[in-house]
Amino acid sequence: MTSQATPPISGASLATGQRSLGDPSVRFPLWPPLTAGCPVTSTESVSYPVEVDYAYDKVPTGLFTAAPGQPRGHERWAPLLPPLHAPGLGEGGTPLVPLGEGLWIKDESRNPTWSHKDRINRVTVSAAVGAGAEGIVVASSGNHGASAAAYAARAGLRCVVIGSAGTPPAVDAFLRAYGAVVLPVPESARWPLLRRIVERFGYHPVSNVTPTHTGHAFGPEGYKTLAYEIYTELGVPGAVFLPTGYGELLFGVWKGFAELVALGLADRVPRMFSCEPSTGGPLAAALRDGVPATRVPVGATAAYAISSAVGGYRGVVAVRESGGGALLVSDAEMEAARAELARAGLWAELSAAAGLAGFRRRGDAALDGPVVCVSTSSGFKDRDLLSAEGSAELDPEDWAEVERRIRA
C-alpha cells in the first residue's frame, strides 16, 4: 500500500526517499517504509539501518526562527520529518533545565506519556496510518510500548504490545488504559512472535525485527526534533550525553545537528556521548572492536530500559562522526545521578539518569560550549516504584521516628 491512502494531516514533508546507512548510494522510494533494515547492504552478520532523505534545498528559511503563532512540537518541524499522517498528542517542546553553570538537562519526562519515545511514535504510527495498516505491533516492556499504545489509540489503530511479566506498574497501567493487547512472553520469544503477527495480521511493526538493531526507517527522524529544540534555545552545545540502548536516540539527535550544518545554520555538531550500563555495552564494544554492530553478554542491572545485548550501526555512526565517545556507567553512578536530579526537582527513571551519570564520569574537559544531558523518562517508569518505608503507616505519636526520618 502507498501513502496515497491517507493524506498527511500536518505540514508539507520534504522527505524524498530512503537510503542505506551501510552504503548511502543505495536508495529506495519513500514508501513503503522499510522496517527490517536495508535489503541490499545487510549481511548475515550485520543488518544495516535505513534513514530518510530530504529536499534540503527547499527547507523554509524561517523554520528555525521563532515567530508568533508558530506551531509547536512535531508540527513545527514537519518539513524535516516523514509525512505526519497520524494526529499528535503535544509531543516535544520539553524544557532545558539548568543544572549548574554550563550544564543543562533536557527533561523528556514532560512528553505526553512521560518519555522521549513519544517523539518516535508520532512518526512510526504516522507511517502505519500512511501505509493503510489496521494496527501496530511493538516488542517492549517499557516506555516504547506505553507510548506506542497511546499514539495508536489516538490514530484509531489496534495495538499489540509484546512484553514480559516484569512490566513496571505505570507502564502496565498505560497499556491497559489505552486498550492495547498485552502479550507477556519470554524475552527470547518476543521477536519471532512479532514477526509472525506482522505476517499473519498485516500489522505495522514499530520496533525492531532484525538480529542486529535496525528499527523502523522513519523512527529516529522523530528524535531529530530534540536537536532542533536545543539549537533554537542554546545554539550548538559542546556535547550531548544520552542514555543509550539500541542507539536510535543517539543517532536521531546527531542527525538533527548534522542537518543544521548541511543547511548552513551551524558550523559543527556537538560531540555525542553514549551512556550504557556497564553490565553490557554493545555500542562501546562495537566501537572498541571497529565493527558495525556486535552482541555482548549482559549482566544484571536495574536500568532495564537501556539494557541490551545487541546494538546497531546507527550509534556507531553518531559517535564516530561527532568525535564523541562511548561511556559505561554503573548502577551506583546512575543512582547518584538520579539523586542529583531529584535534588534539583527532576524525578527521573534510573535509565534516564545515565546521561548525567556519563557526564559526571567523564567530566567537562575539552568540551567546547555548554553540555546537555538528556533525561529520557519519569521516575514513575521504574519497576521498583514504592519503598517499604514510604508505604507503611507511621504512628504520629512516635516522635523519635518522625525526627529520625526528618534528619536522615
Positions of the model-derived regions?
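PLP-dependent amino-acid enzyme catalytic core
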Residues: T2-A408
